[in-house]
Amino acid sequence: MLGLGKKVSREAEAAPSASAAFLQVVTPTLLQADADVRALIDRQLPAPNQCQIVAGSAALRIESPFVLSLFVDPSSLDPIADAVLRRRQAGHATTLIVAINPTQLAALGRWLEARANASTLVGTRLILAPTVDGVVRQLADRLAQVTEDNVIRMPVSPEIENTDYKNFFVFNPQLHRLAARIRGFTQNGISRAYLLGGPGSGKTSFAFYFWLMRNKGRFVSVNLAAESTGDKAAIKSLLCGHVSGAFPGAGARTGAFLHARDGVCFIDESHGVTGPVMEVLMEALDNGQYLPFGASAKQPIQCAIVFASNRSWEHLQSAVNLDEFTRMGAAILEVPELHKREEDMIAVVATTLARLGQRCSTWTAPLGLSEAGWKAIRECRWHGNVRALVRVLEAAFVDTASAGGGELIQADEIEHGIALWEPKAHHSHQIYAAA
């Protein structure tokens, strides 16, 4: 199944046995007998003596509601994840918390992609820390059960058949709530929504998820930044279509509204919905009908319309005619900024390093980041969100690998990439959404 949405039935969830620990910790043998590790973890649990530390194995038996994989090599994670998956398939909301150190990032990325491609990445949380102490400090925040999948799988080109697929990873609880909200919209007849989020935050992925949950029709996208929004005839033809002979030499054209019938028409960069664009949309938004260019009969709108903008709501309100703007009548869906989503940031770093490393033939691919390198990423504001982080990682990867810089990308390379692609001060930062 593509995308999120496989929820665990809480009614069907069997109560854990009285002897089951609250948290099972799977760790390398070296840490298994360490009493200090047990004591550190135990202090984060709701009751004492609720931590069981075991060595990972294919025969691992899961009975606890939470399982922590502590610095296990990502290439050995499958038996643990499979055991958790079997537990979930039996009706339990068991959650797997994968804790790695920064040197294991590329290996984690390969594991995440493999699980996502096999549709077996579900109910998982992520922690990145160099030491057990660092893991323990984040553990309490991860002890919340996950009832969603961790990936939206979507075509690289959603409107082209037989295209490759890509994975949009969803680990942050805020994104899980956004997915649940979208699912509620589609289940209850809401056919108009406005996605707000900074550039590169994942708006297109969630618009596509809206279509996945609607489960009918086509997904059709219109990017107003790529269109001649000052030409009313061109915009009317694009959205409403035109009939044969509408202008000299014209053949008939199916507009975006008709092409998306029963599905979703995604209007991106919709801060451009002003002037001629709004004139075309006004009747469609007010009355649910439109007139193809050159036609004599109106057509009903039979698709959901999802708008998206990287502008803040305040900027949108101040830049448009409010009477026109309110005609859009859309419920608001906010995509949180990446700097608030550490687990998603870990997934982006891991999968990007894995992807870049797979292409290397004469270079030695870095395996991960130094502690200082991860700190630089974690402390960056990321106004450009996922897109900017990927550009920074690509620059740092090339600088490190081409110079034979070793197994880890250092902070200097990360800072250089940030200076190139994510400057701390830029005039555009003031107009972007800050969800």
Predicted stretch roles:
Residues 1-156, 339-342, 350, 361-365, ...:
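N-terminal accessory segments that target, anchor, or regulate ATP-driven/P-loop NTPase machines
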Residues 125-198, 396:
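Flexible nucleotide-interacting loop at or near the entrance of a catalytic core
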